[in-house]
């Protein structure tokens, strides 16, 4: 035993050194709606691959501008499919890397139980002062919210009540803090264990807005980064898929 122990320790050390040598860090721009899922995925990704994931969260439109201005992101998880496609057309993306990692769900939510009914009729009642949405110019969930209000014929009525967050996280914060009685949020922000975790919500029917297809790409700065390729592969795997679905997304 005394002669085998040093050999075992050396083998473990060699394995650790080998893993560290092959490990990389990947800088990821993450659409705000995907904050909780990517945090859960990152833990498993880092444990399973040895790579490190460093995430920044924000609005898709703002990330587009930052990427065009040379931001050091290597992977982009967008809240739509049009922005990654545009970056691809403009030569900012590793060819063939674009894919849909999730299909988002829009929800009308209030932290107050019973406030939002199952059919969204509360929107027609107008019995509230403020309705929160994400900026429709930069945030796909905000655009989906405006499309839904248009389809319902409520855009003119609800317009004066709108408060806009820079992204879907800020739209959620306006509601959770009480600055708005209700708001359009990503289902992933309020969903846990297969149900709405707190308050009351209406899942907005998909026919009221364009599909929220969320695409990912490897950006040119991640072309030679092993961690960037590993992350994209991981997002396509069964473990990530299960986590993504657990937050209310479709695949």
Curated annotation (Swiss-Prot):
Domain of life: Bacteria
Knockout or disruption consequences: Deletion of the gene reduces cellular molybdate concentrations and results in inhibition of anaerobic growth and nitrate reduction.
Location(s) in or outside the cell: Periplasm
Keyword Aminoacyl-tRNA synthetase: no
GO terms, biological process: molybdate ion transport
UniProt entry keywords in alphabetical sequence: Metal-binding, Molybdenum, Periplasm, Signal, Transport, Tungsten
Residue positions binding molybdate: 60, 168
Gene Ontology cellular-component terms listed: periplasmic space
Pfam families: SBP_bac_11 (PF13531)
One Gene Ontology term of the molecular function aspect: molybdate ion binding
InterPro entries given in the database record: AvModA-like_subst-bd, ModA, ModA/WtpA
Signal peptide: 1-23
Family of this protein: Belongs to the bacterial solute-binding protein ModA family.
Listed PANTHER family: MOLYBDATE-BINDING PERIPLASMIC PROTEIN, TUNGSTATE_MOLYBDATE_CHROMATE-BINDING PROTEIN MODA
Function: Part of the ABC transporter complex ModABC involved in the transport of molybdenum into the cell. Binds tungstate and molybdate. Can also bind chromate, with lower affinity. Plays an essential role in recruitment of molybdate for nitrate reduction.
Subunit structure, interactors included: The complex is composed of two ATP-binding proteins (ModC), two transmembrane proteins (ModB) and a solute-binding protein (ModA).
Name this polypeptide is given: Tungstate/molybdate/chromate-binding protein ModA
């Amino acid at each position: 035993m005394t002669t085998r122990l040093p050999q075992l320790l050396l083998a473990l050390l060699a394995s650790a050194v080998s893993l560290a040598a092959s490990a990389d860090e990947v800088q990821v721009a993450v659409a705000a709606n995907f904050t909780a899922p990517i945090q859960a995925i990152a833990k498993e990704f880092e444990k399973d691959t040895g790579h490190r994931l460093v995430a920044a969260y924000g609005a898709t439109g703002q990330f587009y501008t930052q990427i065009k201005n040379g931001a050091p992101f290597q992977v982009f998880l967008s809240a739509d499919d049009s922005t990654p496609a545009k970056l691809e057309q403009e030569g900012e993306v590793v060819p063939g890397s674009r894919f849909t990692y999730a299909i988002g769900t829009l929800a009308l939510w209030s932290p107050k139980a019973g406030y939002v009914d199952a059919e969204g009729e509360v929107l027609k009642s107008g019995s509230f002062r403020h309705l929160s949405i994400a900026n429709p110019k930069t945030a796909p969930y905000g655009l989906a919210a405006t499309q839904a209000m248009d389809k319902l014929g409520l855009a003119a009525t609800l317009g004066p009540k709108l408060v806009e967050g820079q992204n879907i996280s800020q739209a959620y914060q306006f509601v959770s803090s009480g600055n708005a009685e209700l708001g359009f949020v990503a289902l992933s922000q309020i969903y846990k264990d297969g149900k709405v975790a707190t308050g009351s919500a209406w899942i907005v029917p998909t026919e009221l807005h364009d599909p929220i297809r969320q695409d990912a790409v490897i950006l040119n700065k991640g072309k030679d980064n092993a961690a960037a390729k590993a992350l994209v592969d991981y997002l396509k795997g069964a473990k990530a898929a299960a986590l993504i679905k657990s937050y209310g997304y479709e695949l």
